[in-house]
Amino acid sequence: YTISNRSAESNLHLVEKDGTLCMQDNANRNTDFSAHWTWVREEGTPLSYSFTPDGVTDASFWGIRTAKAISPTEIHSDYHGEKVWKLSQDISSFPKFSTENNLLIEALYNMALEEMLMDVRSDSTFRAGALWPDTWTRDAVYSIWFSYAWIMPEVSRKTLDKQTLRNPREALQDTGSGGSWPISTDRVVWALAAWEYYLYTGDSSWLEGAYEGLSYTARKDIHVAFDKRIGLFKGETCSMDWRTHTYPNWFTNVTIGSSFSCGTNALHMFMYEFLSKAAGILGKPESE
């Protein structure tokens, strides 16, 4: 792919050089670039969408679809019929983002803050989404990891506590192919949000409970989901967790449950990194 950026007088390109994507030698990043980017395939045909400072245009077999920011608090779109978004929630207590050169990004940021508030349940935990009214581990964890830990720390903590089983403490596994654990073992994603929450709050007493729960989770998974011959954990993919998005139709639940997902194994590795760091902070003995 080539990425071109339309400046006031010419098209400037990012080009492949030594295996990386970089600016042309004569390009000045401070003066030559605007907020209009166009992606072009190697064959030379533009992709079906383009961005401008205040909108995006998408051309497909459905026709031309556009979304345009009218202001930082209003977007007009005809992607799924004529629709208008206007900010309706009070977001004044959250970090403010502004830009002189991209109104669309500013409006989308404000929309994201509003949707965050709308996703808080009556029990002060995050719901998975409009069609998933309860709390789900993986959905909430990624949001907490990305930013919610410091934007809404109290709701983040309550969400993590809700997604923790008791007696003994362990991370709660969302449903997946074949039901849940151990076909799916990505509950260890809980560690991502737990560490992010600790980094923001420095709450060592909460870290103690998180360490206890993830320690038991690790011991349980090492006995049930770890393949010593391969050196990897079994289990379904995370993030794109609907099997129709990630596996061919001929994959059965048994096949998925005995496969080794790269992303899920990366999460297991992070959990062990969490346990190592937390043990050092809490002064745990090396035997643990």
Predicted ranges, named:
Residues 1-77:
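Lectin-like carbohydrate-binding module/patch detector with strong preference for beta-trefoil
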Residues 37-39, 136, 242:
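Signature tryptophan residues that serve as conserved aromatic anchors
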Residues 61, 68-71, 172-188, 222-288:
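The feature captures the catalytic groove of carbohydrate-active enzymes
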Residues 76-88, 245:
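Charged, glycine/proline-rich intrinsically disordered loops and linkers
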Residues 81, 88-208, 212-215:
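Substrate-binding groove/exosite segments of carbohydrate-active enzymes
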Residues 111, 115, 220, 274:
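Solvent-exposed, charged/polar functional surfaces in cytosolic regulatory/catalytic domains
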Residues 213, 217-225:
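Active-site cavity-forming subdomains of large catalytic enzyme subunits
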